[in-house]
C-alpha cells in the first residue's frame, strides 16, 4: 500500500478517520463499481453513516449533531473518498452535510428545531441544492427563476440545471429571485433561499424532472428541473428576503476545502491502483513498474497529491480567521491544486494499465472520469484562478 499518512492529524481528526474508515471498510471496490455502472445511489452506505450520526458532523450539538468543524469534515470526507468510494461516493454524503448550512446559519428557530434533529439522525435528507440555470452557471447572480409573494406563500417559476440528488432527497434548498435584477443596485441583491418540500411539490404537479445523461458520478443523479407555480409557505424562506446570495457565500470557502480533501483522496486511490498494477503486471520477463516510464508519472502524481494534501489540511485549520479573503485564497488554492493533482494521477494510473485502463473492472477509468469532474465543480479551475489573481495578486477584476 502506498504510504499516504503524511499529514499530522489532531486527536479528533484521527478519531473521525478511524470511525468513518471502519464503516467504509464494509463497502469494497466491487460495491462502488457496480453502483456506478448501474447509476444506483448507495443507500446502504449513506444509511450506515447516518446511523452513526455522521450526516450531522457539522450540525450544532443542540440539534443532535456532532458540532465538529471543517477540520473534522476534511478528515471525514478524505477518508470516504480514499476508501474506494472516490469523489462521487463522497458526493453522496457531501450534500447532506453542507446543504443544511444556510438553515443552521439563517433559518428560523422553529424551522431549525423541527428539521435539524431529523437531518442529524438521517430521518430527513436535505441532499439537494437548486441554483444553476441554463443561462446562469458560473454567473450565479444571473438566475431568472422567480419567487413572487402571494399572501402567506411564494409562487416559484423557472428552470434549473444540475439539480442533483432530488430523487433521493426529502427537501431541497432553492435559490430564486424575489426582486428582479433590473430593480436592485447590486447584482448580488434580490436573491432569496427557500426550503422546498419535494414530495409536496410533486403532489401539486409543480415539479418536472428530466435526468441528465452524464459521463461521471454515476451514483449521483442530476436533473433539469422545471418549477411550475410551485407554492412554498412564507415561513420556509431562509433568512431575510433578497439576501440569499450572501447566505450562499457564507461557508463557501469551507466547502471548497472539503471538496479538495475528497479530490486528494480520489487521486491517492488512483496512484495506489496504478502502483499495484505496475508491480503485478509483467512484460518481457519483469514487472512494468521497474521501468522509469511507468515509475515517473506515478511518482509525480504522488508528489503533487501530497503537496495538495498538506495545503488542504493546513488551510482547514485557518477557517476561523476573520480575514475571509485570506480564507478564500487558501480554499481556492487548495481546490485548484487538488483537482490538477488528482487528474494527473488518475491519467497516469490509466496509462499504467495500458488497454486495461479503460476496462471498468480495473476501476481507474472511473477515477479518471471523476478526476476530470473535479476540475469543473463546485467551481471551475479558471474561476479559482480568477479569485487568486484578483484577491491575492492584486490584478484587475477580469469579469
Give the residues covered by each predicted segment.
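Hydrophobic, small-residue-rich alpha-helical packing segments that form membrane-like cores
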Residues: 133-139, 154, 163-164, 189
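Alpha-helical interface subdomain recognition
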Residues: 1-84, 93, 106-111, 122, ...
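Flexible, small-/acidic-enriched active-site or ligand-binding loops
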Residues: 142, 201-231
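A short core secondary-structure module
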Residues: 157-207
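Long, acidic (Asp/Glu-rich), low-complexity accessory segments flanking structured domains
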Residues: 228-246
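N-terminal glycine-rich flavin-associated loop
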Residues: 88-110, 137
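A short, Trp-centered hydrophobic/proline-enriched beta-strand micro-motif
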Residues: 122-131, 175
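Glycine-rich phosphate/pyrophosphate-binding beta-alpha loops
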Residues: 96, 136-137, 161-166, 218, ...
Amino acid at each position: 500500500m502506498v504510504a499516504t499518512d503524511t499529514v499530522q492529524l489532531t486527536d479528533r481528526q484521527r478519531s473521525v478517520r478511524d470511525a468513518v474508515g471502519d464503516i467504509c471498510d464494509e463497502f469494497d471496490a466491487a460495491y462502488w463499481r457496480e453502483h456506478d455502472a448501474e447509476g444506483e445511489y448507495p443507500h446502504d452506505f449513506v444509511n450506515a453513516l447516518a446511523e452513526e450520526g455522521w450526516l450531522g458532523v457539522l450540525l450544532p450539538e443542540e440539534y443532535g449533531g456532532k458540532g465538529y468543524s471543517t477540520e473534522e469534515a476534511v478528515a471525514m470526507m478524505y477518508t470516504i473518498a480514499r476508501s474506494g468510494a472516490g469523489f462521487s461516493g463522497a458526493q453522496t454524503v457531501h450534500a447532506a452535510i453542507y446543504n443544511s448550512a444556510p438553515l443552521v446559519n439563517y433559518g428560523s428557530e422553529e424551522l431549525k428545531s423541527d428539521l435539524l434533529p431529523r437531518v442529524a439522525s438521517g430521518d430527513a435528507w436535505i441532499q439537494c441544492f437548486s441554483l444553476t440555470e441554463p443561462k446562469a452557471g458560473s454567473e450565479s447572480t444571473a438566475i431568472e427563476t422567480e419567487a413572487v409573494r402571494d399572501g402567506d406563500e411564494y409562487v416559484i417559476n423557472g428552470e434549473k440545471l444540475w439539480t442533483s440528488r432530488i430523487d433521493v432527497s426529502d427537501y431541497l434548498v432553492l435559490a430564486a429571485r424575489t426582486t428582479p435584477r433590473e430593480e436592485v443596485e447590486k447584482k448580488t441583491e434580490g436573491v432569496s433561499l427557500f426550503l422546498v418540500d419535494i414530495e409536496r411539490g410533486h403532489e401539486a404537479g409543480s415539479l418536472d424532472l428530466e435526468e441528465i445523461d452524464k459521463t461521471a458520478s454515476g451514483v449521483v443523479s442530476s436533473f433539469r428541473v422545471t418549477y411550475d407555480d410551485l407554492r412554498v409557505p412564507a415561513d420556509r424562506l431562509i433568512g431575510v428576503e433578497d439576501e440569499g446570495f450572501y447566505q450562499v457565500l457564507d461557508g463557501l470557502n469551507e466547502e471548497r476545502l472539503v471538496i479538495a480533501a475528497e479530490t486528494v483522496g480520489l487521486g491517492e486511490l488512483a496512484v495506489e491502483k496504478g502502483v499495484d498494477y505496475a508491480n503485478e503486471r509483467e512484460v518481457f520477463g519483469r514487472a512494468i513498474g521497474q521501468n522509469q516510464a511507468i515509475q515517473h508519472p506515478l511518482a509525480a502524481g504522488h508528489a503533487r497529491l501530497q503537496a495538495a494534501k498538506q495545503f488542504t489540511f493546513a488551510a482547514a485549520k485557518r477557517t476561523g480567521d476573520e480575514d475571509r479573503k485570506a480564507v478564500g485564497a487558501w480554499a481556492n488554492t487548495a481546490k485548484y491544486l487538488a483537482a490538477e493533482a488528482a487528474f494527473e494521477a488518475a491519467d497516469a494510473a490509466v496509462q499504467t494499465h495500458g488497454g486495461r485502463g479503460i476496462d471498468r473492472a480495473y476501476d481507474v477509468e472511473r477515477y479518471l472520469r471523476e478526476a476530470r469532474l473535479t476540475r469543473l465543480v463546485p467551481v471551475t479551475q479558471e474561476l479559482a484562478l480568477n479569485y487568486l489573481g484578483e484577491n491575492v495578486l492584486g490584478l484587475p477584476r477580469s469579469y
